[in-house]
């Protein structure tokens, strides 16, 4: 088994996820990358195990944790990157929309995080970083994602509670809350840049840098790190 640190990254095949995989490998981590189409977008190697599946299913979560332990021996970092965002008026959300958001954003966090924490308790160390959303606590008029933000805001609360629950066990929990990021999830809309005072979208690198900081900052836990070009300042 390798002595390198190991990271599990969900939603790993595109946008922020692909950037996270690349950067963690560059930083010397072994990586287990999960997504629905991991093998189509990524190339496995001695340091990179690919796992395809629906992260909202218990089986996928179990397989990811098993892959990390069986191949690399530990789980040092879990990055809960998988997520979906639906933008529509509250009265237009359907039951199918609600179920999809809960499956990916909540069950996709719950199943794999619970299993990972059980392993981290054995190690007496570990770090969980989750990607949430700046809109969860900084709503913007005209951006109608109330049910999406119900899930992301719930994650923020859970993360802060988990940070307290497991502080004595050496396990840290934090979140990165992006604003608008230049990824395929966000169509090329020139108005997006006006949603934050910086007047430009965040890049994938901006988000990856924030995740790496939280993964390596040993005394930081329970933080929701906004990466949104000063939008919380509400000065524009």
What are these regions (language model features)?
Residues 129-154, 159-160, 164-168:
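Catalytic loop of short-chain dehydrogenase/reductase
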Residues 196-207:
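A conserved structural motif in NAD(P)-dependent oxidoreductases
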Residues 113-114, 160:
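A short, exposed helix-loop element centered on a Lys and neighboring polar residues
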Residues 205-227, 232:
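C-terminal substrate-recognition "lid" of short-chain dehydrogenase/reductases
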Residues 13-14:
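Conserved glycine-rich cofactor-binding loop
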Residues 167, 172, 220-222:
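Short, small/polar-rich loop/turn modules that mediate ligand/substrate recognition or access, typified
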Residues 89-90, 97-102, 192-193:
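Substrate-binding pocket helix/loop in short-chain dehydrogenase/reductase
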């Amino acid at each position: 088994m390798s002595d390198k640190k190991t990271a599990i990254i969900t939603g790993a095949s595109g946008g922020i996820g692909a950037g996270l995989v690349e950067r963690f490998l560059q930083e010397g981590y072994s990586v287990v990358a999960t997504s629905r189409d991991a093998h189509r977008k990524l190339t496995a190697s001695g340091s990179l195990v690919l796992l395809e599946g629906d992260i909202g299913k218990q089986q996928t979560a179990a397989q990811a944790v098993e892959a990390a332990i069986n191949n690399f021996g530990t789980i040092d970092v879990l990055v809960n990157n998988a997520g979906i965002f639906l933008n529509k008026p509250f009265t237009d959300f359907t039951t199918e929309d609600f179920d999809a958001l809960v499956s990916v954003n909540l069950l996709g966090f719950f199943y794999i995080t619970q299993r990972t924490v059980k392993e981290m308790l054995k190690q007496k160390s570990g770090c969980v970083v989750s990607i949430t959303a700046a809109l969860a606590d900084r709503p913007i008029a005209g951006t109608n994602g109330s049910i999406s933000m119900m899930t992301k805001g719930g994650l923020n609360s859970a993360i802060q509670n988990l940070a307290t629950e497991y502080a004595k066990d050496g396990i840290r929990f934090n979140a990165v809350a992006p604003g608008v990021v230049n990824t395929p999830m966000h169509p090329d809309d020139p108005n997006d840049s006006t949603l934050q005072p910086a007047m430009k979208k965040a890049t994938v690198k901006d988000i990856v840098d924030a995740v790496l900081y939280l993964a390596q900052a040993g005394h930081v836990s329970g933080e929701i790190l906004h990466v949104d070009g000063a939008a919380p300042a509400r000065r524009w």
